[in-house]
Amino acid sequence: MPKQMRALYGAAWQFTFLMLLIDCIWAARIGFRLERSGVALTIALTCGLVVIDAVLWIVSRVPFKNVDRSMFYRHVLDAFLWLTVMATFSKVGVVFQYLCVTTNFPLATHAFIAADAALGFHWPDLYRWVQAHPWLHTALAWAYKSGACQLLVIPAILAVTRNTQDYAEFVVQFMVSATLVILISLPFPAESAFVHFGIHDPNTASTVSDFALFRNGHTRELNLSLAQGLVSFPSLHTILALCYAYALRHVRYVFPMAIALNALMIVSTLTQGGHYLADVLSGLVAGAVVICVVRRVVFRLAVPAAEQIPSAVTS
């Protein structure tokens, strides 16, 4: 990993530990706690990634006669190093999200519904229409769930095609995006459209049931293994869809497919994620801003212009 990238990587870990410190202090003050089995599993998974990182570091130092082979292992190592910090930050960020929910600010749900109405959008009508078309419901459900799969597939693609700097940029985008949406949602909390409109089909209101429980103080114990996404405004799924496609921009034949899949994922957030149209539109704006800021400010300062050109653009 180039010196400038190592500095950015170190900064990512510093930010993660800073948020962890905030989590610990805040949790101690309000009696918030983590269920032990979830913590144990999280630690085990993190340790597993660290072990893989160590093995890859050793392999990447082997003096292979084939230079391409040596470079391949170095790119795989870089991808796993960034994956490790992102996985760790994800858990720390989830706790921060739940802590913010406990602040119990007045709900902004009606403001978002009013904004939707001003645009001529009525969420229940769209939901019922999608439900009346099983093939469309299945396609949108698949696209929505692809978000989690892409978190694992994208680093593999970028490692194999030697575009690991693009993956590093994506991880920074992920961290900035997650922090941004949580901070925005702090003074503007909103219950999911599933909850507001009383939708109790499978994988609807049950996926955001923690919102009311932690908001009202009925529980203060979180199982990290069963954590839910509780931020409605803006939509993190929408932001990540933009970042996913952008991360694959230098992988020639995969990029068009990434655009199509993530465009469908953005549409799916309305009915599969229980988001209001205001959530999605704000997510599009926030996503564009995050990509621009990370690229033009954070990443440009960390990596000289000459190094920002991918070493290989392959299919």
Regions found by a protein language model. Name each.
Residues V153-V160, T238-F255, V285-R296:
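Membrane-interfacial alpha-helical segments at the cytosolic side of multi-pass membrane proteins
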Residues M1-F17:
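N-terminal membrane topogenic signal
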Residues L18-A27, A178-L186, N262-T271:
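Aromatic-anchored segments of alpha-helical transmembrane domains
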